[in-house]
A protein has these predicted regions:
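Interfacial transmembrane-helix boundary/kink motif in multi-pass membrane proteins
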Residues: 13-26, 42-72, 94, 124-133
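Alpha-helical transmembrane segments in multi-pass membrane proteins
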Residues: 1-42, 89, 97
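Alpha-helical transmembrane segments and immediately adjacent membrane-interfacial amphipathic helices
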Residues: 31, 69-77, 110
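Transmembrane helix-loop-helix hairpins at the membrane interface
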Residues: 79, 92-214
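Juxtamembrane "helix-exit" motif on the non-cytosolic side of transmembrane helices
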Residues: 2-11, 72-85, 145-154
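Membrane-interface helix-loop-helix regions
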Residues: 60, 64, 78-96
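Structural signal for membrane-spanning alpha-helices in multi-pass inner-membrane proteins
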Residues: 35-40, 66, 70, 74, ...
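Short alpha-helical transmembrane interface motifs in multi-pass membrane proteins
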Residues: 16-21, 28-31, 69, 101-103, ...
């Protein structure tokens, strides 16, 4: 089980079921969203105050520009087969369902654990924004150690997997951290560099197959 479904497995047709998806999504929601929010609330945290501090109009150009880059980039580069082979109804239901389960299993856990708990506390300890962004990136890479494609079956593949994740996902995490450090809004990355952007072209057809959407 990892940050992005199906964890350390590589998805193939009929390799995973709807039950697998919901177990992953609900487990990550409970462990990395609900319980941490309860902990934050006991320490005086207020979601109402957090949302009232956002400046959506100021940040709108960032959201649109980077969402477009992260959404269309994989499609135009040919790294995903998002276009073609399915009908409009499958697109509509597959995209909606994918956003829902990815929000529960990946989006909200990252928002809460990284952007609402880790980054604000690191920002208090370090004056350098770059240091905060770098440590945020490293945190995200650790969060990604059980993402699809890694292999911990032997010492050699374990070292290769860890090295690969840290080298690639640290940069991704730094991008996510930058949005929060610059805007103060932990949800900007959620739209621009996560669930509503790249995960849509990468995951839609997988969820259409798993949930047998016609």
């Amino acid at each position: 089980m990892g940050l992005h479904f199906p964890g350390t497995d590589v998805y193939t047709t009929r390799s995973h079921t709807q039950v697998d998806v919901w177990i992953w999504a609900l487990t990550y929601t409970l462990v990395y969203t609900v319980l941490p929010l309860i902990w934050l609330k006991k320490r005086g945290f207020s979601l109402k105050k957090l949302f009232s501090s956002f400046r959506w109009i100021r940040d709108l150009w960032i959201i649109i520009a980077y969402w477009a880059l992260d959404f269309f980039g994989p499609i135009l580069s040919g790294s995903t087969n998002f276009l073609g082979g399915i009908n409009a109804n499958q697109y509509a239901q597959g995209i909606s369902l994918g956003i829902l389960v990815n929000t529960l299993g990946a989006g909200l856990p990252v928002v809460v654990m990284m952007h609402m708990i880790f980054i604000p506390r690191i920002a208090v300890l370090f004056k350098s924004k770059f240091t905060v962004i770098l440590l945020g990136g490293l945190f995200y890479s650790i969060f990604s150690l059980f993402d699809p494609g890694v292999d911990y079956g032997s010492m050699e593949t374990t070292l290769t997997s860890i090295t690969y994740i840290i080298m690639t996902q640290t940069l991704v995490g730094m991008g996510k951290s930058t949005f929060t450090v610059v805007t103060g809004n932990p949800f900007v990355h959620f739209i621009t560099l996560h669930v509503i952007s790249a995960r849509v072209p990468f995951d839609t057809k997988m969820y259409i197959e798993i949930f047998k959407i016609k």
